[in-house]
Amino acid sequence: MTTAAYVHRVEGFGTVTVRPVEPERDAPLLHGWVNEERAAFWGMVGTTVEQVRDIYAHLDSLTTHHGFLVSLDDEPVALFQTYDPEADRVGECYEALPGDIGVHLLIAPGTAPQPGWTGRLLTALVAFALRDRTRVVVDPDTANEKAIARMVRAGFELGPEVVLPEVDLPEVFIPEKKARLAFLARR
């Protein structure tokens, strides 16, 4: 069992625990999440449990990209990925600064039942991402107005609209995406 990378108590919300994805252990759970149509931009709709395991085993071997399973009061609620923007397609669309960290967040199906739930979770995850970095970069789809509004409420400054190039690797295919960059600097 992997030790938690980060534990953050959010008053009135619960204890958020962030731990590295364990590909063998977590693949069945993540498979269900990334195969939903709402997760299409993760590029894994139609994958098998074994393919999800292999993708996260590959991710685990990288020094630039990291996958984390997020739990709230010991219940898995999200998949959180961090990455070095210069080693990712987003790095082709803006000038990355030293200390930047990119993040992707996938909320588990059936969670976030109360207004403000995702915002409280995001507060803990941003604190985790900014422990040793100075700025978080996100790239939600331009059509995802809900996610963009959530980022603004969380204090992110909107950046330009960009087109992220497609990624076609043996492990995953991610189509070209129109994205709205947003940035949150550590205060």
Question: Where are the predicted features?
Answer:
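Conserved catalytic-core motifs of GNAT/GCN5-like acyltransferases
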Residues: D139, E157-R180
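Conserved acetyl-CoA-binding loop-helix of GNAT-fold acetyltransferases
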Residues: Q114-R131, A149, R153
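An amphipathic alpha-helix signature
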Residues: E24-H31, V49, R53
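Conserved beta-strand-loop-alpha-helix junction that forms the acyl-donor binding cleft
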Residues: V137-I148
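Conserved N-terminal entry element of GNAT/NAT acetyltransferase domains
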Residues: M1-E24
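Acetyl-CoA-dependent GNAT
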Residues: D60-G102, L106-T111
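Helix-loop element at the rim of GNAT/NAT acetyltransferase active sites that forms part
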Residues: G32-G46
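Active-site rim helix/loop that mediates acceptor-substrate recognition in acyltransferases
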Residues: G46-G67
